[in-house]
């Protein structure tokens, strides 16, 4: 009887694990992997960083940097005329529209950053997207791995997602939406807002791209500065 119970437990575990599929990181999917809603031609997300570097005089220098970190499009930016491209590149962010804000402080350099999203419509008019939901509204219904990866990235607090040993994600279908589990091991305070540790988060996402639930389902201690 005990052997039957063990076999059934193993089979149920295998069946449950079979429902999960690995979710690739955002840069795995190309900019044309997304089905943009009608009238949308091009969307990009920019990261704005302000770095303070102290000097011996007790003051310091501040440098500002802008970088495009994500694109999705029906037509690439090169499709548009030079005047449209120039106007789009010059459109400035609004702090009230910023998302994924972060900061890093130390005895030496410190930095703070935020992200902003921008859109070109099919007529070549530039728009600021006001929040995360505006971004996901560009692609809903959310129903592909690429869509899910974008929604996860928008809501995740992880700063460094490049190391497969310390970061991974998987997803499965659940009712009319999806469940994502995000695993992250942080060895430094700067790469995870919750500090050093081994974390497993679970997200519930509907096809409108809304995160209906985000919860920490596991946390383990990890030594800061370790490997």
What is each residue range found by the language model?
Residues 17-21, 208:
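Polybasic, low-complexity, intrinsically disordered segments
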Residues 186-187, 214-227:
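Short, solvent-exposed aromatic-acidic interface loops
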Residues 46, 73, 121, 130, ...:
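A structural detector for beta-sheet-dominated domains
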Residues 146-199, 206-209:
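Acidic, glycine-rich flexible loop segments
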